[in-house]
C-alpha cells in the first residue's frame, strides 16, 4: 500500500541513488549537473530543514521508499509553489503512481497551504508527463525553446500551472 510521508534523513541514500540514475534524472534536470554524493545530499537536507519555502515528501510502498515529491519556492505572499515528482523505483513507473501522488500533492498545496497556483516545468518531449499534467488540469503557460542540452540534443521546456478553483457561494 502506498503512503506519503515527510522526507527523513534515512531517505537520503535513496535520493542519491535516484538522482544519479539516468532514467530518473533525465526528466528532473539533474542530468546537466555533476553526479551527486551522500555528503552533498546531507548538506542539501540540512538546508532544506531550515527552509519555510519547501515541503518534501517520500513516496513509500509500506516502508520501502519508491520516489520523492514536493513543493518548493513556496511563496506565502504570491500563494504559489513549484511542484516536483520523481518515481525513483523503476518497478513503480507507468503504473498510476504518478497520478496518485500528484493528486495528493495538489490537494496538499491548495487545501493545506492555501495556494492559488501550483506550477511545474517539464521537457516538452516527455509526452507521458505532459499528458498526465494536462489531465490533472495543468495548462501550458509558456515554452522555452532549446532550454537544456542532454542526450546529444537540445530540449524545450514547458512551463505549466494549475490554479485553485474556489467555489462561489
Model segments located where?
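A short, well-structured alpha-helix characteristic of acyl/acetyltransferase catalytic modules
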Residues: 1-42, 168-169
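Acetyl-CoA-dependent GNAT
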Residues: 36-92, 163-166
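Glycine-rich acetyl-CoA-binding "A-motif" of GNAT/NAT acetyltransferases
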Residues: 64-67, 128, 154
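Conserved acetyl-CoA-binding loop-helix of GNAT-fold acetyltransferases
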Residues: 94-108, 130-135
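Short glycine/proline-centered loop/turn elements that form peptide/ligand docking sites
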Residues: 98, 102, 125-129, 146-151
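Conserved GNAT acetyl-CoA-binding A-motif
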Residues: 111-121
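Conserved catalytic-core motifs of GNAT/GCN5-like acyltransferases
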Residues: 119-122, 139-156
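Conserved active-site tyrosine of GNAT-family acetyltransferases
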Residues: 133, 138, 160
Amino acid at each position: 500500500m502506498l503512503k506519503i510521508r515527510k522526507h527523513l534523513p534515512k531517505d537520503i541514500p535513496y535520493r542519491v541513488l535516484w538522482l544519479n540514475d539516468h532514467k530518473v534524472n533525465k526528466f528532473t534536470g539533474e542530468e546537466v549537473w555533476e553526479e551527486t554524493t551522500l555528503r552533498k545530499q546531507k548538506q542539501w537536507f540540512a538546508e532544506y530543514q531550515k527552509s519555510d519555502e519547501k515541503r518534501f515528501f517520500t513516496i513509500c510502498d509500506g516502508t520501502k521508499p519508491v520516489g520523492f515529491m514536493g513543493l518548493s519556492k513556496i511563496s506565502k505572499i504570491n500563494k504559489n509553489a513549484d511542484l516536483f515528482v520523481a518515481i525513483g523505483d523503476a518497478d513503480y513507473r507507468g503504473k498510476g503512481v504518478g497520478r496518485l501522488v500528484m493528486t495528493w500533492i495538489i490537494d496538499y498545496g491548495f487545501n493545506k497551504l492555501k495556494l492559488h497556483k501550483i506550477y511545474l516545468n517539464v521537457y516538452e518531449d516527455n509526452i507521458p508527463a505532459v499528458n498526465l499534467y494536462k489531465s490533472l488540469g495543468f495548462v501550458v503557460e509558456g515554452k522555452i525553446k532549446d532550454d537544456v542540452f542532454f542526450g546529444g540534443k537540445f530540449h524545450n521546456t514547458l512551463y505549466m500551472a494549475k490554479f485553485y478553483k474556489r467555489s462561489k457561494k
